[in-house]
Amino acid sequence: MANVDKAIVFGMRAFHCGIVSPNEYIADYVKTHPEKLIGFAAVDPMQDNVHEVLEHAIDDLKLRGVKLAPIYQNIHPLDDRMWPVYEFCEKRNLPILIHQGTTFPRKAPLKYSLPILLEDVAMKHPDLKMIIAHMGHPWIDETIVLIRKQPNFYADISALHYRPWQFYNALTIAKEYGVMRKLLFGSDFPFTNPDATMEALHNFNKMTEGTNLPKLPVEEINNLIHSPTLEYLELA
């Protein structure tokens, strides 16, 4: 943690896929470096006690955001059971980090993972802050047009750099649509780490050396690395 100023940490709560991280574990981890770590709560809207889990995580454990993963939880983002979570987070000014993109478990339904499904959420809860993880890959275009039109929607770049062509297209299209400032730095640790993500950003333009393909201005790259995530999410 020596080289880290601030980091958001979280687990996942998806009983359908057998991934259940106790929020108490995250809260205890935050206590090891309270000046550097911000914890998010993981909730599974498929569980009947989701409201109790939310209240305990926020009020008792002092976690400051919420992690959702509809594709892992086997639930449509617009399912009736999702709306109380959105409403709770909007009222409490809690940002939601949502995995709205592909994944590898066979039992995780892709039909629930399209980023464009979140447009109705943004329309009904305009003050809700939401971050689409991994830019919603491979449906990156949907994510970009969504965050362009919704002021409180963002996307993070975690877990993209080890797919170089997708990484290149994602940032290039984001630049063309004028939404680079809506992209947040992320690593997807432990699958990769912040150093690897920063190295990929610093080497971004090397991918197209010797070609006429567009380059990304160094200033844009540096702005992404130093994106004011905590200010955007009101967590500073």
Where is each model-derived feature located?
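Active-site gating/metal-coordination segments in enzymes
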Residues: 3-112, 153
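Catalytic pocket-lining loop regions of alpha/beta-barrel enzymes
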Residues: 64-65, 78-185
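Acidic catalytic loop of the alpha/beta-hydrolase fold
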Residues: 162, 191-192
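Mid-to-C-terminal alpha-helical segments outside catalytic/metal-binding sites
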Residues: 1-2, 6, 55-56, 177-184, ...
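Catalytic cores of Mg2+-dependent Asp-rich isoprenoid enzymes
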Residues: 188
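A generic secondary-structure signal
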Residues: 2, 28-32, 56-60, 120-121, ...
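Short, well-ordered alpha-helical microsegments
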Residues: 23, 50-51, 139-143, 167, ...
